[in-house]
Amino acid sequence: NPQTMKQATLDLIGRHHTVDMVKEKFRMARDLGFDNINMDLIIGLPEEDIDDVRSTMEQVRELAPDSVTVHSLAIKRAARLNIFKERYANLKIQNTQEMIDLTAKYAREMGLEPYYLYRQKNMAGNFENVGYAAPGKACIYNILIMEEKQTIVACGAGTTTKVTFPAENRLLSKTVDIIPKI
C-alpha cells in the first residue's frame, strides 16, 4: 500500500518502500492475474498539501486499482511520528475538507463508489476513513475488520492476532513478541 506517491514523505515517515516499488509490484500483481487490488492512501501526512494529494491521486488513477481506501492520518502508538514526536514537532500536518473532497472526486472519476466508512482515535482533522471500490469489488473483509467481527491470524514477530467470539461479543488480542523454536 503506497500511503502516498510522494517519495520525500515516505522517507520522512520511515517507510521502507519507494513509489517505484509500489508501481512495479502493482503491475506485477496484475500480470500475475490479480483482479482485485486495493491501494491504501493516507491524507494528512507531514508536509503534504493539496497539490501532493492531487499528484498521488493522479498516479493512483494511472494504475487503476479496483479499490482505494482513503485514511485520515491517525498517529499510532508505535508510529515513527509518535516515537520521535520531538523531531517532528515543527512539521506541518494538514488534513482539510478540500483534500477529502479531492480524493472522493478522483474515486468517482475512476468508477469507484464508497462502500464503507469508519472513524478512529487521534485522526488529523477529525475526519473519517472511506473505502471506495469498483462495482462488485467491495471487500467484505474490510467491513468485518472494522466491526471487529472477523478473526485475524498473524504470523511473525511483532504481529497481533485478534480472535473474535461473536456469540459472546468478545475480542481477544495477542501480540507475538517471540516465536518459539519448533
Language-model segment annotations:
Residues 75, 122, 158-161:
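Short, solvent-exposed loop/turn segments at secondary-structure junctions
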Residues 3, 42, 118, 156-158:
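Anionic group-transfer/hydrolysis microenvironments
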Residues 64, 111, 123, 149-153:
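A generic secondary-structure signal marking the coil-to-beta-strand transition
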Residues 131-182:
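Radical SAM enzyme core and accessory elements
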Residues 1-103:
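Conserved non-cysteine loop/helix-boundary elements of the Radical SAM core domain that shape
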Residues 106-119, 153:
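Acidic/polar loop patches that form or flank catalytic/metal-binding clefts of enzymes
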Residues 119-129, 136:
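Conserved catalytic loop of SAM-dependent methyltransferase domains
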